[in-house]
Swiss-Prot record:
The gene is hbb. Red blood cells. It holds the Pfam family Globin. This is Hemoglobin subunit beta. Heterotetramer of two alpha chains and two beta chains. The lineage of its organism: Eukaryota, Metazoa, Chordata, Craniata, Vertebrata.
Length: 146
């Protein structure tokens, strides 16, 4: 993937200004609520029986923050995102057995939450760069699947 200087600038600034403790939990909770089959990977996280239980689940919130912080790795390695996510891809494939399509689903939920929070500040240019960035991250996370 080739990045323009404008895309690099948008991504770096955009990610750095996200409120991880707000956006991460909301995005993961939305994913688990809207796509309930994704809950199967979170059986050890406690009560996921209702949308309110999911939204109020501290383990889900903490994992949402962790996932969002995981994007920092891609920002720091934009010229080699595939390599930066190699170990995470193996972990999700070989140990956790996560369906790789769920990475795209979570990215979609993340985009919805960010757009809702930023409103007009989530410009077309920002979304364009962010969607490209997420597509590369999703590809990298699914790369080690066999």
């Amino acid at each position: 993937v080739e990045w323009t200087q404008q895309e690099r600038s948008i991504i770096a600034g955009f990610i750095a200004n996200l409120n991880y403790e707000d956006i991460g939990p909301k995005a993961l909770a939305r994913c688990l609520i809207v796509y309930p089959w994704t809950q199967r990977y979170f059986g050890a996280y406690g009560d996921l029986s209702t949308p309110d239980a999911i939204k109020g689940n501290a383990k889900i919130a903490a994992h949402g923050v962790k996932v969002l912080h995981g994007l920092d790795r891609a920002v720091k390695n934009m010229d080699n995102i595939n390599e930066a996510y190699s170990e995470l891809s193996v972990l999700h494939s070989d140990k956790l057995h996560v369906d790789p399509d769920n990475f795209r689903i979570l990215g979609d939920c993340l985009t919805v939450v960010i757009a809702a929070n930023l409103g007009d500040a989530f410009t077309v240019e920002t979304q364009c760069a962010f969607q490209k960035f997420l597509a590369v991250v999703v590809f990298a996370l699914g790369r080690k699947y066999h």
